[in-house]
Design a protein with these regions (language model features):
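Beta1/beta-strand and adjacent pyrophosphate-binding region of the FAD-binding site
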Residues: 1-12
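Short hydrophobic core segments
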Residues: 7, 142-152
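Active-site-adjacent segment of FAD-dependent monooxygenases/related oxidoreductases
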Residues: 38-110, 126
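A conserved short coil-to-beta-strand element within the FAD-binding core of flavoproteins
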Residues: 118-132
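Glycine-rich loop(s) and the adjacent beta-strand/alpha-helix scaffold that form part
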Residues: 160-179
Length: 179
């Protein structure tokens, strides 16, 4: 039995895995995709994420593969706070594609002792007084004390548990091109 199963090998799941390993927790990450994505998806890290990477000793890896952009002090037409007044040692946005972020976080989690299983899709789960049993699409079962769903907006964990997604979908459309 492992301590924690994390479903989802994106930035959230991989960062959580690394954090748990720092505390000696036995972690397995299940990612349904067989190979890492080659697509950018998201394009960068904001100040607080950069600060966390620095606190964990990971920032140099990110800086080596990203590009720093000065902060701009606006969001949805709001011009405050002024960037020069933010209390941070990192007054920039780091342009770095999500697939690179995921690779760096996976390397860190694996170096810390996390087992990352790719091509493993969660198909079912059951819970009792001693933990959780995860059933994978191939019929394999894995037992853990806890299971954490870090599997995104279309979360299979949330669906299996009957947890709704309250609120409304975003009304903003974006176009991202890799040219």
């Amino acid at each position: 039995m492992v301590d924690v199963i994390i479903t989802g090998g994106g930035p959230t799941g991989l960062m959580l895995a690394g954090e748990l390993r720092l505390h000696g927790v036995h972690v397995v990450v299940l990612e349904k995709e067989k190979e890492p994505s080659g697509h950018a998806r998201a394009l960068g890290l904001h100040v607080r994420s950069i600060e966390v990477m620095d606190q964990r000793g990971l920032l140099e890896r990110f800086l080596a593969l990203g590009r720093q952009y000065p902060l701009r002090g606006f969001f949805a037409g709001i011009t405050r706070p002024a960037p020069g007044r933010l209390d941070t040692a990192h007054p920039y946005i780091l342009g770095i594609p999500q697939n690179v972020t995921e690779r760096l976080l996976a390397e860190h989690a694996i170096e810390a002792g996390t087992e990352v299983r790719r091509g493993c899709e969660l198909a079912g789960l059951s819970q009792d007084d001693t933990g959780v049993t995860a059933e994978l699409a191939d019929g394999t079962r894995l037992r853990a004390r806890y299971l954490v769903g870090c599997d995104g907006g279309r979360s299979i964990v949330r669906k299996l548990l009957g947890i709704g997604f309250p609120g409304e979908p975003a009304r903003t459309e974006w176009l991202l091109a890799e040219a």
